[in-house]
């Protein structure tokens, strides 16, 4: 939590291995994100703020692509993509290119991409920014269910009320 410019995004990108720190390291479930990058990436689902997606693909095609990059079989990735798009109320948008999505829809597809491979830890940078109130409630429920099943969510926000409502520590 912190105001814009406080270093939330920088901290998260270093902790997930997307940005190299000057010194030190980060561990995810005992795995050094710099020494064992592939193992760490399998444990992490990351949604960086402002990440450009492959917007010339449809949502389902993008999610299948991401799932396969994480080692999922194409049929498993398709099934997971279908489930995630339905859970995020994006099933109807499946035939549209991501470039035609609203900012909120794009944010939800990015969340689905972070979840596609069933990671143990989700790292979400400003996950509620540009998302409508109904979708924000839905996302909160998805994240709550995820943590109840044993997952860990690390998120950044500059909205203290969101953090207080969602976070346990």
Language-model features: locations:
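ABC transporter nucleotide-binding domains
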Residues: 1-168
């Amino acid at each position: 939590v912190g105001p814009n410019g406080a270093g939330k995004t920088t901290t998260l990108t270093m902790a997930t291995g997307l940005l190299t720190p000057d010194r030190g390291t980060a561990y995810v479930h005992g795995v050094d994100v710099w020494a064992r990058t592939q193992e760490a990436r399998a444990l992490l689902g990351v949604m960086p703020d402002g990440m450009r997606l492959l917007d010339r693909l449809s949502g389902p095609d993008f999610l299948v692509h991401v799932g396969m990059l994480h080692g999922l079989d194409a049929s498993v990735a398709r099934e997971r993509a279908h489930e995630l798009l339905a859970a995020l109320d994006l099933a109807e948008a499946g035939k549209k290119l991501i470039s035609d999505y609203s900012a909120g829809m794009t944010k939800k597809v990015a969340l689905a991409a972070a979840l596609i491979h069933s990671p143990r830890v989700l790292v979400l940078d400003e996950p509620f920014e540009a998302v409508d109130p109904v979708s924000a409630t839905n996302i909160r429920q998805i994240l709550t269910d995820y943590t109840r099943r044993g997952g860990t969510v690390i998120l950044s926000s500059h909205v203290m009320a969101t953090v207080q409502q969602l976070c346990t520590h």
